[in-house]
């Protein structure tokens, strides 16, 4: 149990998708203007990561990995070259289902997210979750914990940035730095803050 808690903490703070690896920056900056919308997208990312990382783990372990098809009497077949295509297919399917559910049950959030909801499909943070899982050779329970943790790390970062950007609206920001300029500086300072977690050994 301690191993899984360590993995979760590590994925949220030490290896934060947005502030340590700078993944998913396009959506991260575009949707972080309002806290409510940022939290909505953050929850969507957590849900997508929590489903796609374990799903891709099963896909890799029982279909794509070298020797994975031994159960079908094909031990010499290696389909790992289909990894990228397969992971994107799984991610696209999950995002499409999530989009339909939000459209039906939470139309206000669906409209607020707009084009950025289908763009989760090509959000590199989502893809990175599956690629890191394969690279680090996580088993299924580890991939579940890592999927939730990596999604939560991105959601936490965008919610924090949105809160800061809302406060900055009432601040006396120099004209040349208003908008994206101060947002990039804020992200850099947040990243420096999260670097302090890198000294923690888990």
From Swiss-Prot:
GO biological process: respiratory electron transport chain; sodium ion transport
A GO molecular-function descriptor: oxidoreductase activity, acting on NAD(P)H, quinone or similar compound as acceptor
Disulfide bridge partners, by residue number: none
One Pfam family from the record: Rnf-Nqr
Keywords annotated in UniProt: Cell inner membrane, Cell membrane, Ion transport, Membrane, NAD, Sodium, Sodium transport, Translocase, Transmembrane, Transmembrane helix, Transport, Ubiquinone
UniProt EC number: 7.2.1.1
Record bears the keyword Transferase: no
Annotated compartments: Cell inner membrane
Described function: NQR complex catalyzes the reduction of ubiquinone-1 to ubiquinol by two successive reactions, coupled with the transport of Na(+) ions from the cytoplasm to the periplasm. NqrA to NqrE are probably involved in the second step, the conversion of ubisemiquinone to ubiquinol.
Similarity comment: Belongs to the NqrDE/RnfAE family.
Protein name, UniProt field: Na(+)-translocating NADH-quinone reductase subunit E
Phylogenetic classification of the source organism: Bacteria, Pseudomonadati, Pseudomonadota, Gammaproteobacteria, Pseudomonadales
Gene: nqrE
